[in-house]
Amino acid sequence: MDTVRWIISTAPEIFLLLAVAIGTMLGRLKIHGFAIGTTACILIVSVLIGQLGTFTFPALLRIVLFSLFVFTIGYKSGPEFFASLSVRTLAQVAMALVLGGTGLVIVLAFAFALKLDPGTASGLAAGALTQSSVIGTASGALAQLGLPKTVLEQQEANIAAGYAVTYVLGYILTLLYVPFAAPKLMGVNLKDEAKKLEVELSGGAPPKTENLSYRKFQARAYRVTAAAGRTVKAIEEDIGSRTVIERIVRQGADIEPRLDTVLEAGDDIVIAGRTAAIVAAKPIIGTEIDADEILKAIPGNVLDVLVDNRNLHGRSIRDVADRIGGDARGVFLRALTRHGREAPLSADTRVYVGDVMTLVGSTRNIERAAKQVGQIVRSGDRTDIAFLAAGIAAGLLAGLVSFKVGGIALTLGGGGGALIAGLLCGWLRSRRPTMGAMPPAAQQTLSDLGLGGFIAAIGLANGHAAWVAIQAHGLLLVGMGLVVTLVPLVVATLFAYHVLRMNPVITCGALAGAMTVDAAVTGACEIAESQTPVLGVAVPYAVGNVVLTVLGPIIVACTFVG
């Protein structure tokens, strides 16, 4: 033990990294398909390791780690958050606000009734509402109150205890509530409602201007006989299904396939579009030919395009196609991805900022259409460190600004400032794609390492006090956590279904998004046997990340007694 104590006093960072490593490995273990999650496991492991001795970490380390995490959260959510400030998505925003507001009211009610200290109340909110970032924002707010060191450490220990006890409970309850309890509360069968929604989304005739096809794309070569003397436009309209003539070869020379170009007998042409339409085009054009060289010369491509045009936010694919019009000629939509999950495709599927469209067609055509949609996702592995560092620095500076609430001087704190900076930087990146690059892999690394390191530092430094608090108030925290998790979910469900008249399938996805529990979306999709719940996730997820994070300073302000 003397050696262990020597390492603790000399190099405590070794145990911090060990806690992150062990907690991450345990968090990935699945039992009957269920995993606790890395954040909770890191905290539990660090609290247990904290029983070995007294760990001391510089405040700067925790500030930097948490700032990296919360800035990245803001960066990822920024485009969706600002785009959600729209009439078209007002219902989903309102639902997320109601859920977060209800959670805040219940936490404060418990705090006043049971005289909970700010740390315990903040930990309860962080765990029961499954939002780890509340730990950081609450800790930052407490640090600004000028508390004695021992008092501040006890408050941080209480945050850790409240979170450790209630997070797993809140996570499990959300996983069970969204796919099972919510549909029963609304009086619907989720599977049947999903089928109805799919029919509704796929209903109606395709619009004339809908050039974004959600069918399989194929290109074939024909030699013109029957189509001689007709224009490209006439042939494309005759074949239908948004088929496009991509190439014309006349006597060995390429002819630009403009809409008014007249085809001649003997021309070799390449048409692209739905497989069924192309196969049926033979009597309209002529004989299909084996022309590998002609087909190889077509610069076909499959590119992902990030939707960042706010004018398209909340609109249907049909509406998006109408707005893009002729610029989408020859471009086909193969997939729509939202938060890493593929959304069901139909003419009425809604598109949101932050979605990724997988487009198929010639490179030229895709690049033309992409200008109207957003930005092509280029493969790259470099992060704009200058942009990242400057953004976090600006956020930390903004966090120093103070204002008074009830005679208490409060600030956004480093966490709140970094969150706002991340939101603005993420939005700015969507407006100016040439600056502020942060590839998804880098975002995930910064987020995981920042939060994991911060949580480990909290658990190690306050391990003994947190363990004492858990032993003293564990059952009480469990009871409060159950209420803080379930009541906001129930209120939000009833509000969305009966007041906002939201589709029950969309409501289930929105509940998971507002609680920022991705796994609950997967559960809803499995019960519904459909991907339609994914359609409700995007906006509440972005709003929920922001709303729940700022609860930390609010709870501290309302419960602190000087």
UniProtKB/Swiss-Prot annotation:
Belongs to the AAE transporter (TC 2.A.81) family. It is a multi-pass membrane protein. GO terms for cellular component: plasma membrane. Its main location: membrane. PANTHER family: K(+)_H(+) ANTIPORTER SUBUNIT KHTT, PTHR30445:SF9. It is found in: Cell membrane. InterPro entries: AAE_transporter, RCK_C, RCK_C_sf, YidE_YbjL. Residues 207-287, 295-375 form the RCK C-terminal domain. This is Uncharacterized transporter bll3471. The keyword Thylakoid does not apply. It comes from Bradyrhizobium diazoefficiens (strain JCM 10833 / BCRC 13528 / IAM 13628 / NBRC 14792 / USDA 110).
